Amino acid sequence: MSNSEGWXSFXQTLSGLPQWASADCVAGPLVSAGITDINIEDDQGIHVRLIVRDAEGRMVWRAWNFEPDAGEGFNRYIHRSGIRTDTFPR
């Protein structure tokens, strides 16, 4: 699956989730799209934070699932850097 195909699948699935979606609801699309640089951290039951890390493990973007403009920074990162879909540990 290419980066753009993985992102399209991930974005379509997430766009259908309610704002209060659980970490399990968010994790499924990440795993099925083969996306490895986006992680779920700070799972608080109904609120989760998505974290994007670069190849060295440094955080480059983060947002809570309830933030109204959370996707804006994420889209900038995706357009600039793409999405890692390898499965190698960092």
UniProtKB/Swiss-Prot annotation:
Pfam families according to UniProt: DUF905
Record-stated family: Belongs to the UPF0401 family.
Protein name: Putative UPF0401 protein YpjI
